[in-house]
Amino acid sequence: MKPYQRQFIEFALSKQVLKFGEFTLKSGRKSPYFFNAGLFNTGRDLALLGRFYAEALVDSGIEFDLLFGPAYKGIPIATTTAVALAEHHDLDLPYCFNRKEAKDHGEGGNLVGSALQGRIMLVDDVITAGTAIRESMEIIQANGATLAGVLISLDRQERGRGEISAIQEVERDYNCKVISIITLKDLIAYLEEKPEMAEHLAAVKAYREEFGV
């Protein structure tokens, strides 16, 4: 685990974005941890979040031309990541996002920001079922662009309805790499460093045994 990944886990814990306990997910699964990126909701949170996304992006080495943030959650993430890349990595890259409702006046269409062209890096909070990615792919392909990769905050590394995870399905279906700031494996490594969190570690490991990929 890299220093920025450990810092991200501590940041998420401090904001209660990441919580350990017993939670029922939308799928009905009982999970020993919960991650709600919507709680990164202040200016300082967003500034820090962008730096973590930018760090993971640079660390991945994937080449791309534009950041795309799917509406709605992806919009502030794409924006703050673009700012962080410019301020901390000297990479001044265009960004774009879609609006769910097409406008009938002013600037046309349902895209805001730079023209959607070239190799696209899609940024979002998490991938649960991959629906937002599929909708985004239609927009990307309709504009003649290609998907270079997908960047999210957390990869839960767990099976969906079948034998593979929603993330593995996206990688298979679109022949792209999905990268994340942290994974379930990183969470476990972090818990292993914290003796006071031993009960959570046991629960998360048991969960991985049952649902992990």
Curated annotation (Swiss-Prot):
Homodimer. This is Orotate phosphoribosyltransferase. Pathway: Pyrimidine metabolism; UMP biosynthesis via de novo pathway; UMP from orotate: step 1/2. Catalyzes the transfer of a ribosyl phosphate group from 5-phosphoribose 1-diphosphate to orotate, leading to the formation of orotidine monophosphate (OMP). GO terms for molecular function: magnesium ion binding; orotate phosphoribosyltransferase activity. Pfam families: Pribosyltran. The keyword Glycosyltransferase applies. HAMAP family: PyrE. It comes from Escherichia coli O45:K1 (strain S88 / ExPEC).
